[in-house]
Design a protein with these regions (language model features):
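Short amphipathic alpha-helix that is part of the acyltransferase structural core
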Residues: 1-59, 66-73, 140-163
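Short, solvent-exposed loop/edge-beta patches enriched in aromatic
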Residues: 46-51, 79-84, 101-105
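Active-site/acyl-donor-binding loops of N-acyltransferases
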Residues: 59, 122-142
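Short coil/turn motifs at secondary-structure junctions
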Residues: 60-62, 82, 115
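Hydrophobic, well-ordered secondary-structure scaffolds
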Residues: 72-73, 92-98, 104, 110-115
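Conserved acetyl-CoA-binding loop-helix of GNAT-fold acetyltransferases
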Residues: 76-79, 84-100
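Conserved active-site alpha-helix within GNAT-family acetyltransferase domains
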Residues: 102-106, 112-130
Length: 163
């Protein structure tokens, strides 16, 4: 068994593991592996030429305390069913977080299905997402106060304050 970054010749194996573990649409999987997937930032547990587990460390830049910081967004945490319960993910997560530090990143981020799985590794909930669904016609009762215009470069400072 070996824990390491993937090679480009293993892209299909990583993709197969993703489609096995997640219910994403084919369009999404195609988009992800064409536009986001980076074998140099994807760690795997491999045994006998077979990929058993994977963690993708997608690179992002975030603004924190007025500073732009590079970070790894942990996604695609996955293990084949027959390899679960053997400690592979614990080893892979520990090695991945070591690599985050080796990249001079102070922290990693993720949006887990169940945050309890990641507390062991030092992750904590920093915010919740509130989703409200409403019918667009319910917005009729709100009156427009002001006007709209297409944003330009001159509006950048104002937009930064809003977002």
């Amino acid at each position: 068994m070996e824990i390491r970054f993937t090679n480009t010749n293993e892209n299909q194996g990583v993709r197969d593991l993703w489609t096995y573990c997640f219910t994403d649409s084919q369009d999404y999987v195609d988009f992800y592996f064409k536009n986001k997937y980076n074998p140099e930032k994807t760690m795997v547990v491999e045994d006998g030429g077979r990929i058993l587990s994977a963690i993708h460390l997608n690179q992002h830049r975030v603004k924190l305390g007025g500073k732009d910081l590079d970070t790894s967004y942990v996604v695609g945490v996955s293990t084949l069913a027959e390899a679960r319960g053997m400690g592979f993910m614990a080893d892979l997560m520990s090695r991945s977080l070591y690599q985050v530090g080796a990249m001079d990143q102070s922290f990693a981020i993720l949006m887990p299905i169940d945050h309890r799985l990641y507390r062991t590794y030092g992750f904590e909930t920093c915010y919740d997402i509130l989703e409200i669904k409403l019918d667009i016609f319910d917005l009729k009762k709100f009156k427009l106060d002001g006007s709209f215009k297409r944003a330009s470069k001159e509006d950048a400072d104002d937009l930064v304050e809003v977002y």
